[in-house]
Structures are given as structure tokens and as C-alpha cells.
Amino acid sequence: MAQVQQLTPAQQAALRNQQAMAANLQARQIVLQQSYPVIQQVETQTFDPANRSVFDVTPANVGIVKGFLVKVTAAITNNHATEAVALTDFGPANLVQRVIYYDPDNQRHTETSGWHLHFVNTAKQGAPFLSSMVTDSPIKYGDVMNVIDAPATIAAGATGELTMYYWVPLAYSETDLTGAVLANVPQSKQRLKLEFANNNTAFAAVGANPLEAIYQGAGAADCEFEEISYTVYQSYLDQLPVGQNGYILPLIDLSTLYNLENSAQAGLTPNVDFVVQYANLYRYLSTIAVFDNGGSFNAGTDINYLSQRTANFSDTRKLDPKTWAAQTRRRIATDFPKGVYYCDNRDKPIYTLQYGNVGFVVNPKTVNQNARLLMGYEYFTSRTELVNAGTISTT
């Protein structure tokens, strides 16, 4: 009689993990097939940012939340007698300065800037977020609705109207619920914190650092917001399917955090590798580096090369700025603004057990006074691993 081969503890753990993943995928498919997708307005406000610029939005505690669409409109008046102002490279992406989301368990998810949110939205869409495409069709397709809109300049004495949209993701995508939040918890509440630009941050004088500004120019000191309005729409799945033991839920999806986060690094030296370490136990999907060279943002002329490097000093990619941009064009079919470098790892996320096993490397050619590197991360982590995970590197 043949002996039954016993599984080793490692094999048993692998089998349990495989079974859990299969059950999660099956539950996800049932939820997507049987629940109802809803997008619902949960809050709208109009305000003067000179008086208040930070707001806490309370989303609806219903269903499985996939994310939030935030619409922002603003009116800006240039009160200067003669001088105009012009859009900065980041422009209306800076209408929102910071976004933070807390789930019903008070667990923080995304905490990042408006520009980082917009750039990740662009990378995942494969084109500038919510922008129309040029077509030679005789049918009048095109930029009919001005969905994202801002005047290139605001003349002296004139008022400009701006419209901007942000997608704040909780789930990874419409069909991949990794990171989604179960909000059917009446006793608790979610919180979406929005910090908007104000008269001190939105307008940069000539020669000032335009990183957080929307407009820059000689007339900047006399520019002001007339008002800002925002509307938040919650995207969620309602009427969740029910089985014998209650709701059918993709438990692994709901126990995973999908986060966007950013940090700032200083201390760069010309022609010396500057290494930013990836924290352990996160699965990094993308990295965005913005080289703020003391207020100058250049098209790669101040960088020798960029790299992702493992602990044994092997470069998984090491490219000059132009070749790095060529890789980016394969993802979004265009370039990001000057000084912005995008690294895509979503096909094979970076995942390390030890802090410092993988680093993002920038070797600058020139470094101006007050130069810094702004890092934006997109990653997964599980709630169980979060206890032991490292913190995002910053200086």
C-alpha cells in the first residue's frame, strides 16, 4: 500500500495561501457581478481660502468603497495694474495641496499631494488624466466640455476660471478591488481630508519656487482667490451579495491597503549617487521623483542618470534622463512636466523583507542651493504586515 506523502509546514502554508487567494478571487467576481455600482455626491462646499482651506469630508458608510472623484473649481483675480501671471508647469494640479483618507477603523490610507495624485491617475489611465485626445475624425470629437481647464495666463485686472478633477483611489481599479474599503459599519465613520491652495501658496513671484503654485509672474503678489468650490462623489458597490454566513466578501482585497504617499529628500551632491531606500514589506507599484533643483525644473539637463538598485549594487535599470523618458512614453504616450521622472513597477512590484534591499538612485549633474528630491510612492501593504513595515524614507 502506497504511503501518503505528508506536506511540510512550508508546503501547508503555501497551500493555505493558494486556497485563500482562490477564495478571494471567487468572492471578488461574485461581488462585481451581483452588486450595483453607484457614484453618489456626498458633499459640496464653496469657500474663501483666505478664511479656511482645510476640510474634513464624511463619506457615506455604505457598501464597498472604491474611491472618490473630487471636482474643484476656482475663480482667481489678478489685481495688478499692469502685469499678468502664467500657469506653472503643475498648474491646476496644485489646487489641492494634500489629500488624506482614514477608513472606518481609523487606518490611514492615502496621504499625498495633488500633483502626485494627478500623476498617478495619468500613469494608470495611460494618458494625461481626463484630457481629450486629438483626432482627425470629421465628427467633432475633442475638448468640448473643458473637463480640466485653466487659462494659460490671467491678464492684469482679469479673472480666470479653473476646473480640476482628482480621483482618490481606494481600490486599485474598477475590476480589481485590492485596497477597497468595507464601509457597512454604522458605528464608525470614514474621513477624507482635503487641504486646498490659498493666496500664500497658489501664486509665485518671478524667481520664486513654483512647485506648489498654480500661477507665477510679476503680478503674483496682487492675485487672489475669489472663491473655491469642491464637490466630492463617492464610488461604491451597493447591494452586496449574501451567502449562508452573511455578506460574500473578498477578504484579502479588503485587508490590503492601496496607498499613495510622498516625502522630501535633501542633501544631494553633484556627480554622487543619491539613494532613497524603499521601505520593507510594501509592494511598490510606481515611484515618481521630482527634482526640485532649488526652484529650477529642467528637462533632464541637471541629471546624469537614474536607477533602481538592489542591495548587492546591481542596477535593475540605469538610464540617462532621455532614455528614462522614452520608457515613460511607452506608458503614457507623452512626457511628464520638466523635472518629473516616473518609474513603473506594476508588472513586477518591488517587495523587500529588509529595509534598504532596494533603492531609487539619482545621480545629479548640477545641484543648486536648496535642491531637494520629492518622492511619490504607490504601493500595496497588508494590515498584518503594516505593524512590522518600515517607514517611508524622508529627510
UniProtKB/Swiss-Prot annotation:
Locations listed in the record: Virion
Example of a GO cellular component annotation carried by this entry: viral capsid
Classification via Pfam families: Phage_Capsid_P3
Record keywords: Capsid protein, Virion
Protein's UniProt keywords contain rRNA-binding: no
Keyword Methyltransferase applies: no
Membrane spanning stretches: none
Assembly: Homotrimer.
Role of this protein: Major capsid protein self-assembles to form an icosahedral capsid with a pseudo T=25 symmetry, about 66 nm in diameter, and consisting of 240 capsid proteins trimers. The capsid encapsulates an inner membrane and the genomic dsDNA genome. The major coat protein P3 and two assembly factors (P10 and P17) are needed during the assembly of the virus particle inside the host cell, when the capsid protein multimers are capable of enclosing the host-derived membrane, containing the virus-encoded membrane-associated proteins.
Name of the protein in its database record: Major capsid protein P3
Classification of source organism: Viruses, Varidnaviria, Bamfordvirae, Preplasmiviricota, Tectiliviricetes
Gene: III
